[in-house]
């Protein structure tokens, strides 16, 4: 998917002076090249404005947390996102603050190449009524409260009982989110082009429940079983809802996903190596040996 860079909407991390200053520099840079640009400080409580909905690209200035927050607001808009990293890890926000002019020059000259990403929709049903729902770009996590107690969950796929789980929690992650909380809990790395999602238990107790990958077309069901524990569901590590025994959490692939701008010279595998997810003891960047 290829697009021309004509209009840019810039979203900055909240209360971040460096992001605001960089956004002003970017606006001037784009204006000098005949590219329309507008700026907004990230506001999670509101929808993206009309300018963003008609933009060629949404630039996000911040870390991966800001990138996730803006990504949820952009699900289904058909407008690609590109992050400029002002945080620590920067797996989602790929462009460095020092290298933005070089990256954007190439995009202005060559246009945008976009990749599609899957998002998750989840809903909490209580006594047959939906009491909470949301969208996640990275993950939906069920976890315990302030006390160090395992939580009791009943799991199912497409209406078929899978098994019960006693654990500190459970992570349902998209391919995009596979490099986040899920990989720390022993979950699989999943290429972002795949239309699947992963289920990863957090410290399962006396249970041989291994991480698994489900097709995006499947429905994953989590029943909160009786127990003394507090249980919460959190989307992308940013919004939380308290659950009760008997609640049913249903997770499916969202009807529409989102788009990310592909950065020239940055592949999924180069990012895995650069961020330490994959180690290369023989020397970074060596070619794969040719088959004989």
Curated annotation (Swiss-Prot):
The active site is at 64 (proton acceptor). GO terms for biological process: NAD metabolic process; NADP biosynthetic process. It catalyses: NAD(+) + ATP = ADP + NADP(+) + H(+). Its EC number is 2.7.1.23. It is found in: Cytoplasm. NAD(+) binds at residues 64-65, 138-139, 149, 166, 168, 179-184, 238. GO terms for molecular function: ATP binding; metal ion binding; NAD binding; NAD+ kinase activity. InterPro entries: ATP-NAD_kinase_N, ATP-NAD_kinase_PpnK-typ_C, NAD/diacylglycerol_kinase_sf, NADK. Its cofactor is a divalent metal cation. GO terms for cellular component: cytoplasm. Disulfide bonds: none annotated. Keywords: ATP-binding, Cytoplasm, Kinase, NAD, NADP, Nucleotide-binding, Transferase. PANTHER family: NAD KINASE (PTHR20275:SF0). Belongs to the NAD kinase family. Involved in the regulation of the intracellular balance of NAD and NADP, and is a key enzyme in the biosynthesis of NADP. Catalyzes specifically the phosphorylation on 2'-hydroxyl of the adenosine moiety of NAD to yield NADP. HAMAP family: NAD_kinase. This is NAD kinase. It comes from Oleidesulfovibrio alaskensis (strain ATCC BAA-1058 / DSM 17464 / G20) (Desulfovibrio alaskensis).
